[in-house]
Swiss-Prot record:
Subunit: Part of an enzyme complex containing four subunits: a flavoprotein, an iron-sulfur, cytochrome b-556, and a hydrophobic anchor protein.
Organism name: Rickettsia typhi (strain ATCC VR-144 / Wilmington)
Entry-linked InterPro entries: FAD-dep_OxRdtase_2_FAD-bd (IPR003953), FAD/NAD-bd_sf (IPR036188), FRD_SDH_FAD_BS (IPR003952), Fum_R/Succ_DH_flav-like_C_sf (IPR037099), Fum_Rdtase/Succ_DH_flav-like_C (IPR015939), SdhA/FrdA/AprA (IPR030664), Succ_DH/fumarate_Rdtase_cat_sf (IPR027477), Succ_DH_flav_su_fwd (IPR011281)
Keyword presence, Electron transport: yes
Keywords (A to Z) from UniProt: Cell inner membrane, Cell membrane, Electron transport, FAD, Flavoprotein, Membrane, Oxidoreductase, Transport, Tricarboxylic acid cycle
Superkingdom field: Bacteria
Name of protein: Succinate dehydrogenase flavoprotein subunit
Catalytic class of the enzyme: oxidoreductase
Membrane topology: Peripheral membrane protein
A GO molecular function held by the record: electron transfer activity
GO cellular component entries: plasma membrane
Gene: sdhA
EC annotation from Swiss-Prot or TrEMBL: 1.3.5.1
Residues the entry annotates as binding substrate: 246, 258, 357, 402
Length: 596
C-alpha cells in the first residue's frame, strides 16, 4: 500500500507535534540547545488554541501584595481535590516566577501597574497564607488577551532559533517499535503527500479534546489528536473522567467569558437578583474554584432560579464596573459579549452557562514531560522516544480540577522542562535505527481504509451524536444510570464508525477526510472518558456523582489509567497519586475537606 502514496522521509533529532504555547516553548527550547528540531502543526501556529486564553498566567510574584510559591502550591493541590501529584505541582509553582520573567524578557506585553510592575489580578481558588488569608492577586495578565500575547511571542522565538515548521500537516500516527517511539507520520494537506518523520524524541503538544462535547469553549481543531495516537499505540491515558466545565460560557454560543471578569469584580446572579455564590462559597464567593461555581449555577437552574425565557442560564454582571476599567482590563470580553450575546456590558448583564473548557486528563507523564506507563510495581516506567506536554498531557498538576490561570503556566513550565530533558538525553544529529517496513505499512493501510470508506453514515451525523451524548450523559452532575447508558451509546457510536462514508477521495485539502480522522481520535477519548467516569464511585473535583456525593479518600486517591485493546474492550487500571513533595522546602499537603 505504501507504493500507492508519495511518501517523503525526514530525519530529525526531535519532532514536536502541535504549535500552541507548549509546543512552541518546547520546540525553540530544543533548537536553542542545538537539537535539529521540527514542528508539525495542522494549522498556522498563531491560530493554535492558546491564542484564545484570556485571563492570565499564575505566578507568586508578589507585585500586588505578599505572595509565596508555597501558597500557590497549596491552592493548586486543594484545587486538584488532592488528585494532583505534589512533586509535579511543586516543580510548576516553584518555577512559575522565573517562567514569567522569561516571558517578559522574550517580549510578552504584560499589563502594568502604575509603578511599572506586571499587573496581577485575583482568580478563583487563589489565596494567601495556605488558604487562611485573603484572596491572592497572582494572575499576570495582558489585558484579557494573555494567550494571544504569549503565543505570538513564543512563535517569534521559534523563528529566531530556526525551528523547522511543517505547517498544515496532519499527524496520523506514531511510529512505534518494540515499545519505543521512533517517529510520526503526517499528511501534508496542501499537496497530498505523506511524510515519515524519524525522530529520537516525539513531543505531543496537541491540546485537549473539548470537541467531544456539543458545547465547548474549544476551537473546532481541539480534537485530541495526540491522545488518539497514543491510544492506538496501545498506551494508556490518565484521569480522563475529569472534564472541566467553565462557569461562564456565553449562553447558546459557548464562547468563553474569562474568570478574570469575576477577578475584576464581576458577579453572578439568579432570577431573584441574588448573588447566589455567597450561599455556596461564603469566603471566596464568585471566585471559588471552577467546579464549585459550575455546580452552584447548575443547582440554581435546576431548582427554578435560572433566568431567561426557559430559565436555563444565569447572569454575569459587569455593568457596575467603570467603562474605563472594562476598556483597559477586559476589552476582548466587551467585544465578545456584544458579538455573541448582543449585550453592552456597561449597561446589561451577560447570559452565561457552564461550558466544557478543559481536560484535566491526558497522556500520563512525569514533570520532565516523558510519557510514563505502569509496568509491574513500577508505576512510572518511562516510554522511550515520546513526550507529552500541555493539555494533551496529564503530569498531573491539575488533578481533578484545574485552577484558572494555571494552564498557561503549565504550557511554558513543562514546555521548557521537556526541552531541557531532551537536550540531556539526545546527542545532536545522532543516527537513527532502521525501522521495520511493516510499521509504516500498517499506518498507511489505516489511512487508506478511512480515505476510501464507502459506508452509509456521514461523519458529521456521527460526530453530532457523540457530542450530544457526552453533553447529556457525562456532564456537570453524573449518576451511574446516566454514565452506564452513556457508555453503551458511545460504544455503539464508535462501532458505527466502521460504516462511515467519505465522499471526497482526494488528498489535497480534503476536509471530509480530516474530519473523519479527527472523529476517530475523539471517539476513542470519549469512550475512555465515560467508562472511567462510570467506574469512579465518588465525587472529586469536576467529577460530581449525585449517587456518590462525597469524596472517598480511602479508596479513590488514585489515578485512573484507561486504554482500549485490539478487540475494542476498555481496560481500566489504577496507580497511586504522588503525595510526597519534590524537595524539603515544603511539606506534604495532607487531604482535608475542600471549602471555599
Amino acid at each position: 500500500m505504501t507504493k500507492a502514496y508519495n511518501i517523503i522521509h525526514h530525519k530529525f533529532d526531535v519532532v514536536v507535534v502541535g504549535a500552541g504555547g507548549a509546543g512552541l516553548r518546547s520546540a525553540f527550547g530544543m533548537a536553542k540547545e542545538g537539537l535539529n528540531t521540527a514542528c508539525i502543526t495542522k494549522i498556522f501556529p498563531t491560530r493554535s488554541h492558546t491564542v484564545a486564553a484570556q485571563g492570565g498566567i499564575s505566578a507568586a510574584l508578589g507585585n500586588m501584595g505578599e505572595d509565596d510559591w508555597r501558597w500557590h502550591m497549596y491552592d493548586t493541590v486543594k484545587g486538584s481535590d488532592w488528585l494532583g501529584d505534589q512533586d509535579a505541582i511543586e516543580y510548576m509553582c516553584k518555577n512559575a516566577p522565573d517562567a514569567i520573567l522569561e516571558l517578559e524578557h522574550y517580549g510578552v506585553p504584560f499589563s502594568r501597574t502604575e509603578d511599572g510592575k506586571i499587573y496581577q489580578r485575583p482568580f478563583g481558588g487563589m489565596t494567601t497564607e495556605y488558604g487562611k488569608g485573603k484572596a491572592a492577586q497572582r494572575t499576570c495578565a495582558a489585558a484579557d488577551r494573555t494567550g494571544h500575547a504569549i503565543l505570538h511571542t513564543l512563535y517569534q522565538q521559534s523563528l529566531k532559533h530556526k525551528v523547522q515548521f511543517f505547517i498544515e500537516y496532519f499527524a496520523i500516527d506514531l511510529l512505534m517499535e518494540d515499545g519505543e517511539c521512533r517517529g510520526v507520520v503526517a499528511w501534508n494537506l496542501d499537496d497530498g503527500s505523506l511524510h515519515c518523520f524519524r525522530a529520537h524524541n516525539v513531543v505531543l503538544a496537541t491540546g485537549g479534546y473539548g470537541r467531544a462535547y456539543f458545547s465547548a469553549t474549544s476551537a473546532h481543531t481541539c480534537t485530541g489528536d495526540g491522545g488518539g495516537m497514543v491510544i492506538r499505540a496501545g498506551l494508556p491515558l490518565q484521569d480522563m473522567e475529569f472534564v472541566q466545565f467553565h462557569p461562564t460560557g456565553i449562553y447558546s454560543a459557548g464562547c468563553l467569558i474569562t474568570e478574570g471578569a469575576r477577578g475584576e469584580g464581576g458577579y453572578l446572579v439568579n432570577a431573584n437578583g441574588e448573588r447566589f455564590m455567597e450561599r455556596y462559597a461564603p469566603a471566596a464567593k464568585d471566585l471559588a474554584s471552577r467546579d464549585v461555581v459550575s455546580r452552584a449555577m447548575t443547582i440554581e437552574i435546576r431548582e427554578g432560579r435560572g433566568v431567561g425565557e426557559y430559565k436555563d442560564h444565569v447572569f454575569l454582571h459587569l455593568n457596575h464596573l467603570s467603562p474605563e476599567i472594562l476598556h483597559r482590563r477586559l476589552p476582548g470580553i466587551s467585544e465578545t459579549a456584544k458579538i455573541f450575546a448582543g449585550v453592552d456590558v456597561t449597561k446589561d448583564p451577560i447570559p452565561v452557562l457552564p461550558t466544557v473548557h478543559y481536560n484535566m486528563g491526558g497522556i500520563p507523564t512525569n514533570y520532565h514531560g516523558q510519557v510514563i506507563i505502569k509496568d509491574g510495581k513500577n508505576h512510572n516506567s518511562i516510554v522511550n522516544g515520546i513526550m507529552a506536554i500541555g493539555e494533551a498531557a496529564c503530569v498531573s498538576v491539575h488533578g481533578a480540577n484545574r485552577l484558572g490561570s494555571n494552564s498557561l503556566l503549565d504550557l511554558v513550565v513543562f514546555g521548557r522542562s521537556s526541552a531541557l530533558k531532551a537536550a540531556e538525553l539526545i546527542k545532536p544529529v545522532s543516527p537513527h535505527k532502521p525501522l521495520k517496513k511493516e510499521i509504516l505499512e500498517k499506518i498507511i493501510n489505516r489511512f487508506d481504509k478511512i480515505r476510501h470508506a464507502n459506508g452509509n453514515v456521514l461523519v458529521a451525523d456521527l460526530r453530532l451524536q457523540m457530542q450530544r451524548t457526552m453533553q447529556s450523559h457525562v456532564s456537570v452532575f453524573r449518576t451511574q444510570e446516566l454514565l452506564d447508558e452513556g457508555a453503551r451509546m458511545i460504544s455503539e457510536i464508535r462501532n458505527r464508525y466502521k460504516d462511515i462514508k467519505i465522499n471526497d477521495k482526494s488528498l489535497i485539502w480534503n476536509s471530509d477526510l480530516v474530519e473523519a480522522l479527527e472523529l476517530d481520535n475523539l471517539l476513542d477519548q470519549a469512550l475512555v472518558t465515560v467508562y472511567s467516569a462510570a467506574a469512579r464511585k465518588e465525587s472529586r473535583g469536576a467529577h460530581a456523582r449525585e449517587d456518590y456525593p462525597d469524596r472517598n479518600d480511602i479508596d479513590w486517591i488514585k489515578h485512573t489509567l484507561s486504554s482500549i485493546d485490539d478487540s475494542g474492550q476498555i481496560i481500566l487500571d489504577y496507580k497511586p497519586v504522588t503525595l510526597t513533595t519534590l524537595t524539603d522546602e515544603i511539606s506534604t499537603i495532607p487531604p482535608v475537606k475542600r471549602i471555599y
